[in-house]
Curated annotation (Swiss-Prot):
Residues 152-181 are annotated as: SOCS box-like. It holds the Pfam family Vif. GO terms for cellular component: host cell cytoplasm; host cell plasma membrane; membrane; virion component. It comes from the Viruses. Keywords: AIDS, Host cell membrane, Host cytoplasm, Host membrane, Host-virus interaction, Membrane, Metal-binding, Phosphoprotein, RNA-binding, Ubl conjugation, Ubl conjugation pathway, Virion, Zinc. Residues 14-17, 75-80 are annotated as: Interaction with host APOBEC3F. The gene is vif. Its main location: host cell. This is Virion infectivity factor. The lineage of its organism: Viruses, Riboviria, Pararnavirae, Artverviricota, Revtraviricetes. It comes from Human immunodeficiency virus type 1 group M subtype F2 (isolate MP257) (HIV-1). The modification Phosphoserine is found at S145, S166. Residues 76-115 are annotated as: RNA-binding. The BC-like-box motif mediates the interaction with elongin BC complex. The HCCH motif (H-x(5)-C-x(18)-C-x(5)-H) mediates the interaction with CUL5.
Length: 193
């Protein structure tokens, strides 16, 4: 019998970002309790040798978001692609599909964090409690409504420290956009080129 390959999207990530992500998840699971219901699986609890951690985020009664971090992958064409990666899956019973980081953040925002949204005016008219600020800015992928922009101009959003874990921040690629850093003038190694 021949080998059958299964292809999946794995975002190449710096290992320090993975450590930061895991620390933020654990902090908000155990200390701040903002990520109540999330489940963290260590590398020694997985049967797959390349899995370094898994974070299971329940969404509805039988669906969840699973963020899996890998180590020991083949390195990429650049020096900093050191064999670390992240995959993001949406699972419901036996069905699995991969999602992009923006959609993952939106799903987390939708199920876990209250926000002033388009329906806030209707809620206020009905006498329901309306939150004047958003606790999870990473869940927004576009400019908010005029009402939201007016409210944010009136009430400054409160910064949460440490920040809530964002999947988009975890997989963002800052390496391919050269950033100028302070250093000697004309130094090609310091200015990102």
């Amino acid at each position: 019998m021949e080998n059958r390959w299964q292809v999946m999207i794995v975002w190449q990530v710096d290992r320090m970002k993975i450590r930061t992500w895991n620390s933020l998840v654990k902090h908000h699971m155990y200390i701040s309790k903002r990520a109540a219901g999330w489940f963290y699986r260590h590398h020694y609890e997985s049967r797959h040798p390349r899995v370094s951690s898994e974070v299971h985020i329940p969404l509805e009664e039988d669906s969840k978001l699973v963020i899996i971090t890998y180590w020991g992958l083949h390195t990429g064409e650049r020096d900093w692609h050191l064999g670390q990666g992240v995959s993001i899956e949406w699972r419901q019973k036996r069905y699995r599909t991969q999602v992009d980081p923006g959609l993952a953040d939106q799903l987390i925002h939708l199920h876990y964090f209250d926000c002033f949204s388009d329906s806030a005016i209707r809620k206020a008219i009905l006498g329901q409690r309306v939150s004047p600020r958003c606790n999870y800015q990473a869940g927004h992928n576009k400019v908010g409504s005029l009402q939201y922009l007016a409210l944010t101009a009136l009430i400054t959003p409160k910064k949460i420290k440490p920040p809530l874990p964002s999947v988009r921040k975890l997989v963002e690629d800052r390496w391919n956009n050269p950033q100028k850093t302070r250093g000697h003038r004309g130094s090609h190694t310091m200015n990102g080129h």
